[in-house]
Curated annotation (Swiss-Prot):
A GO CC term assigned to this protein in UniProt: hemoglobin complex
Sites where the protein binds heme b: H89
Keywords, in A-Z order: Heme, Iron, Metal-binding, Oxygen transport, Transport
Subunit-level organization: Heterotetramer of two alpha chains and two beta chains.
Segments traversing the membrane: none
Source species, domain of life: Eukaryota
Annotated InterPro entries: Globin, Globin-like_sf, Globin/Proto, Hemoglobin_a-typ, Hemoglobin_oxygen_transport, Hemoglobin_pi
Protein name: Hemoglobin subunit alpha
Binding, O2: H60
Domain Globin: 2-143
Length: 143
């Protein structure tokens, strides 16, 4: 998935509108992922509470969106920009890269729900392509 200049500017503009709510987006998206795709819970079995809105879910949701924020700043070279995160997920945490797509979908759902006015069809396409590109960049070290 190649991001066009239009995609990049659309994502940056959308991020400018939604970034103040990034922690809430992350917490909701991660909570949804764990509830809707229970197989993803295996990575978080050390948490005392995996329910939506719990402390660990909120904390990790914040971390996830910190990664998305980083990706927005590295949008012109995601593979290099997200190299350390890819390394961490591939070798230290051994996360199956298919889970990045699942979480990307949950992020899209939450952005659509929280920002219906901003989530235009153009924003939807560009954010979807961006998150797919982020997932691909995170999977880079698995090869």
């Amino acid at each position: 998935t190649t991001l066009s200049d239009k995609d990049k500017s659309t994502v940056k503009a959308l991020w400018g509108k939604i970034s103040k709510s990034a922690d809430a987006i992350g917490a909701d998206a991660l909570g949804r992922m764990l509830a809707v795709y229970p197989q993803t819970k295996t990575y978080f079995s050390h948490w005392p509470d995996m329910s939506p809105g719990s402390g660990p879910v909120k904390a990790h949701g914040k971390k996830v969106m910190g990664g998305v924020a980083l990706a927005v700043t590295k949008i012109d070279d995601l593979t290099t920009g997200l190299g350390d995160l890819s390394e961490l997920h591939a070798f230290k945490m051994r996360v199956d890269p298919s889970n990045f797509k699942i979480l990307s979908h949950c992020i899209l759902v939450v952005v659509a729900k929280m920002f219906p006015k901003e989530f235009t069809p153009d924003a939807h396409v560009s954010l979807d392509k961006f998150l797919a590109s982020v997932a691909l960049a995170l999977a880079e070290r698995y090869r």
